[in-house]
Amino acid sequence: MRVSLRRASTEAIAAFILTFAFLLALAPSAPFTRELGVCESGAVRDVIAGNIILPHFLPGPMVHVPPLYWWTAALDVRAFGWTEIALRMPSMIAAAFTCAIVFMWASIAINRRTAFWSAMSLLTCHFFLDAARQPRMDSMLALFVTAAAIAFERALRPSRDDSSAPIDLRSRHVGLALAAIAMGLGILTKGILGILLPGLVAGLYLVVRRRIRDLFRIDLIFTFFVALAIGLSWYFAAYEVGGQKFLQWQLTMNLWSRFVPAEAGGAGYCVHPFWYFTPHTIAGFIPWSAYLPAVAIYAWRRRGRKLPEAMVFTLCWFAAIFLFFSTSRGKCLIYILPAFPPLAVLTGIVIDAAICSRRESEISAADSTVGANQAPEARDRAFAIAFAVATAVVTVAAIAFALAALAIVIFSLPRGLSPQLHPTDRRFLELFTSLAASRSPALFVLIAACSASGVAGIIGLRRRDPQLQSVSVLIVAVAGSIFWFGVLNPALAERETLRDFAREVARTVPSGNEVAHLGLSDCDLNFYSPQPLTPIYRLRCDESSSSPDFVVARKVDFDTTRVANRACFKPILESPPVDSNGSRLLLQRIP
């Protein structure tokens, strides 16, 4: 059942509150370790110091994208202090808003049940939750791209679209205005992607629907001009501050180098094959990725005019973003985040379709003869099988995990398994084993949830009840998310963080003394230090050396330094070996 705009808005506010509360339960104050966004926290320091227009990564170069994220993070630091939750807050709020507007749009354009499952599959998929806890701008970009795409759908839908109320001129103009604002904010978040991604979505949709003339409508073109004006306002202001150096940095580093091969002048980082994002998208959408074959079957069997208009748009939305990043030369994993909201909507559509199909078949069975029902049942059989198989896979996995966890609680972990794993996986397994040994309540809650999920899945499969099957997947998705991000990850962070070492360094070094860092900097060490560590790339003991009296270095780097260059430094503090880089040392120059 579709709902009115007013009611959908009220329910979206409730969805935002519940989503944000869920994110707050996932240990947002856990210590930082090696998150990429922590390396960029120096820009927040610079904004707080007063360099608002063109902040720099302290220590480091000027920012590589517009600073909307760092502006909002600076406001949160003012409110909550220099803490982990302050830097994570912008991403958490953006993620909650993304779920809320997905829910609101699906309620209006499709129905409330699709809206519920779309929002829940987005909120509880691994990739989206992980990004929501990262102190960087990607969740904000995903929010504005999602908002712009949805606004375009409201503005560009056909006048006789049966899936929602016919569009009028006022609704079209409101939709385009909202799209312009969202794209402008997207530019202020991560540059050209803020306008390019929604533009590709709208363009592909119009091409697929053979509405080529609409691409050249004055109001649509004007929408992009307004968005550019909003975004370019920062670029003009930053050029006034940074001059030619800023212009060259933006054009060469952040536009040209990311999309061309290294041999043609590109940067050559995050280079991966065309199919790179496919397995990562499937893995990142766990456990809901089990339903993707059902999504494909449903869309293929109803291709053309049989598909609801909202689903056609959502398919174009996902395809435009996914194909764009797949063809890009640089493919950093986090780039694909804006593709997850449409993927969640497709999942919600399919879950709703499975539930409706089951209910329609029950009604038909009661009112019709067997022969009259054979055609529609044959048409939907492959879809129903794919949906049931997906549920069965998740059910088996949930039961297997519950049994394995109980076995570890009772018998402990078999010897010889841990050394064969990746170091990070080994640490996770060690933490899991310690939770089992201590009979952690969180672990028993997870076991109970997986057992309940398995039971619900089995009952749903026996009754051929898609709604109960979906609930079984939701149970394990929620419980797994809370355990992974609220229990295991914070525990691992406590083991791997340099927070305590940074605080000990701050207590040891006399106030006012500069502290340097030898070689590659540790991002969390910079975050937890009272002031950014000055980077140096070699130790020197000659009298002309201007090295600070205190230097932080990785022990392996200090040990491999020439004796003549390290003879004048002595270690006075040593951290535990928290990661594969080993211990860190605080060195003091010998007078």
Give the location of each predicted region:
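Membrane-integral, polyisoprenol-dependent glycosyltransferases
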Residues: 1-364, 369, 385, 389, ...
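Membrane-embedded architecture of ER/inner-membrane glycosylation machinery
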Residues: 2-4, 177, 298-591
